[in-house]
Amino acid sequence: MKKFLALLLTLALLAGLTACKATEAASTAQEQHTVTAPTNDATFVYQPDDPAATLPGGESVVLVTGPGGTESGEDAMLWQGIQTFANTYGYTADAQTAAGNTADEAEAALRAAAESGAKLVVCRGDTMGAALYRMQENYPDVHYLLFDSEPHSDDYSAYNTASLVHCVLFQEEQAGYLAGYAAVTDGYTTLGFIGAREIPGIVRYCTGFLQGAEAAAELQGEYVTLQTWFTDTYENNDAITQRMIDWYNNGTSLIMVSGGNLYEGVSGAVNQTGGKAITTDYDNTELGDRVLGSAIKCYNAAVQRQLYTFFAAGTWNGQTGGQTEKAGFTNGEVALVAGAPWRFDSFTQDNYRTLYEDLRTSVLKMDAYSDLDTLPETPNVTVNRLL
């Protein structure tokens, strides 16, 4: 009997030790997979969970862009990501440029890419979404990766995503939150937001900016004002720049701009007045030190991850084909970039990393609001909508 009890005790001790080791291993694995708060999308190189895994290589990936090509902006970051992936894993990268900004011209470029022998065609934006809606099932051996849109009819009355297509929509409100929190933490309490059009993606930047500003203001016991205006055009002009200048001269300390080339206007306005600005979508900090940062979508990181997912399976599978994915904190695909050296003072890089992790793990909560008629309560931020 004593021997039997001793055996049971020994087994219990061994089980306890094994459980401890398993817990330690799980904890270590979790630490290894923690997402690091991104500060520069341009330097990202995708690292798979299994570094020993290999891809077959040899296939072609084609990026189709608007007439602006791959020289700057969002398409430049997508192109960088595609090239990085192709060079790392042995694929071929190519690009097609649409002749103009219409859906017909986008469709012609998409068809040329499909007929070039591409395994996967990458594109971005609503014009490409309208073009893809028409022809997404015409080439059964070609797959598509669409950013910032979903296949839709020209009048947006109908949507349909074929099984050959995977869509990625970024959570702009998350990037906006980072910017609003940083601005108020750094002492900017008279804020502005100027958007090109009052459409869901741009509005989400604004409402995220508002929620971040509210969180920081509440923490610091500050009261903040935020005035908003939508220009109804993606093209900056002298009148828009002058309105920015007037805002700064009348006490606005920092303006966030979103859409089109409004960043050109705010760059001129801050240089004339000494005000500060934050831009969106991609890194514009090269415009000067008065552009404190950019609330960005990490196109480079996102496209590399999507390409790896696609080529690892050889297709869009049941979880990806015909589906739309929302990219954001979870995979480190939105960010606040703030130059080198870091341009915020009170809001340090350590503060940024802590904030990012708290948002990623839902320690801090935020919501997506796609219109300005339904806003969260913000007792510390007064919103003034201008026409």
Question: What are these model-predicted stretches?
Answer:
Residues 1-9:
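Positively charged n-region of N-terminal signal peptides that target proteins for export
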Residues 15-19:
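C-terminal motif of bacterial Sec signal peptides marking the signal peptidase cleavage site
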